[in-house]
From Swiss-Prot:
Keywords: Cleavage on pair of basic residues, Disulfide bond, HDL, Lipid transport, Oxidation, Phosphoprotein, Secreted, Signal, Transport. The gene is APOA2. Homodimer; disulfide-linked. Interacts with NAXE and NDRG1. The modification Phosphoserine is found at S54, S68. One of its GO terms (molecular function) is lipid binding. This is Apolipoprotein A-II. Residues 1-18 form the signal peptide.
Amino acid sequence: MKLLAATVLLLTICSLEGALVRRQAKEPCVESPVSQYFQTVTDYGKDLMEKVKSPELQAEAKSYFEKSKEQLTPLIKKAGTELVNFLNYFLEL
């Protein structure tokens, strides 16, 4: 009977010590994934800024904007003319 009581007491003490050790251990930081995400975004931003500085990309962007301006200018003028005609129609009523 004493052996059984000693065994139960020993098991109880061991499990309590194990729980205490688990509580004292550092928990994994919750901020770690968030900080990793922001670090990744920062790295991508730096890489993007390096790529934007290249003259080839700047020339390509400039030609793209000039081409879109050439294509959109007639459409905008036509839309403006049609808007004026539309408003004149209502003013003549």
